[in-house]
A protein has these predicted regions:
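Structural recognition of the beta-strand scaffold that forms the well-ordered cores
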Residues: 44-49, 69-73, 97-102, 137-141, ...
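Active-site segments of SGNH/GDSL-like serine hydrolases
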Residues: 101-107, 127-160
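Serine-esterase "nucleophile elbow" of acetyl-processing enzymes
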Residues: 18-97
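Sec-dependent N-terminal signal peptides
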Residues: 4-13
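Glycine-rich anion/phosphate-binding loops
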Residues: 77-84, 114-122
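Charged, glycine-enriched surface loops/patches
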Residues: 116-140, 166-176
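Catalytic His-Asp segment of secreted/periplasmic serine-dependent ester chemistry enzymes
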Residues: 9, 20, 143-227
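Cell-envelope and extracellular/periplasmic
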Residues: 72-75, 102-103, 111, 186
Length: 227
C-alpha cells in the first residue's frame, strides 16, 4: 500500500468512527460501568461539559479528590452532543446534582453554525431531563471569551452574552441554580485575562481556583432548593 493510499485509508476510518459515535458516548462507557450505586446520604455531583470541564480535573485533580464528583467533560463538544450523551453520562450515574457548563463550542461553530436559541434549547433540555429524573440542576454561564484561537474570524462576545442572558432568565423562571462565572471572571473586554486563561478560553489553575468555590456554593444552593 503506497503512502497516500494508507493516509486516505486512515482518514476514512477516523471520519467513519466519528460519524458512528458523533456524541462520543464511548468516551466514558467503561468508567460509567464501574460507578457504584450511590451510598446512603451521598451527595453525588456530575460535571457535564466540554474542554473547560474536561481539563478541570487535569489542571486541579485535588479539587475532585475524595469527593463524590464525576467529571464528564469532553473537549470540543457542542451542546447537541452533550444532550445526546446526557442519559449515559449523567442520568445513569444517579447524581443528586448536575453542573452543566456548555455553549462555548457552539458559539465557535465547532459543528457548524447554530442558532443561539437552539444552543439555549439544548441546555434547557438537559436541565429538564435532569429534573424529570429528580436531579438538581446548576446551569453555568458560558465563560468570557473575546476571541477563539481556532476560529479567529468569529467574535464571540455578543453570542455569549445573548446565551447567558437566556440561561439566567430561564433558570430564574424554572427554579434552577444559575452560576454566573462570566461576571466574576470577565475583564473590561469581555474576555479572560492571560492569568486566568493563556489562550483566552481555557482556564489556568488560577482561573479554576476562582471557579471552585463558586461551583461548590452553587451545588449547596441546588441541594436545598425545591426544584
Amino acid at each position: 500500500m503506497n503512502k497516500l493510499l494508507f493516509i486516505a485509508f486512515v482518514l476514512f476510518f477516523a471520519v467513519d468512527a466519528h460519524a458512528q459515535d458523533w456524541a462520543n458516548i464511548k468516551r466514558y462507557e467503561d468508567d460509567n460501568s464501574k460507578v457504584p450505586a450511590p451510598a446512603k446520604g451521598e451527595k453525588r455531583v456530575v460535571y457535564m461539559g466540554d474542554s473547560i470541564t474536561d481539563f478541570w480535573i487535569k489542571s486541579d485533580s485535588e479539587f475532585f479528590a475524595g469527593k463524590p464528583y464525576y467529571n464528564r467533560g469532553i473537549s470540543g463538544q457542542t451542546t447537541g452532543q452533550m444532550l445526546v450523551r446526557f442519559r449515559e453520562d449523567v442520568i445513569s450515574l444517579k447524581p443528586k446534582v448536575v453542573v452543566i457548563l456548555a455553549g462555548i463550542n457552539d458559539v465557535a461553530q465547532n459543528n457548524g453554525p447554530s442558532k443561539l436559541e437552539d444552543v439555549f434549547g439544548n441546555i434547557a433540555s438537559m436541565a429538564e431531563l435532569a429534573r424529570a429524573n429528580h436531579i438538581k440542576v446548576v446551569i453555568s454561564s458560558i465563560l468570557p471569551a473575546n476571541a477563539f484561537p481556532w476560529r479567529p474570524a468569529i467574535n464571540p462576545v455578543a453570542g455569549i452574552k445573548a446565551i447567558n442572558d437566556m440561561l439566567k432568565a430561564y433558570a430564574a423562571k424554572n427554579g434552577f441554580t444559575y452560576l454566573d462565572y462570566f461576571t466574576a471572571m470577565a475583564n473590561d473586554k469581555s474576555g479572560l485575562s492571560p492569568n486566568l486563561a493563556k489562550d483566552g478560553v481555557h482556564p489556568t489553575l488560577e482561573g479554576y481556583r476562582i471557579m471552585e468555590p463558586m461551583v461548590e456554593k452553587a451545588i449547596a444552593e441546588a441541594l436545598v432548593s425545591r426544584n
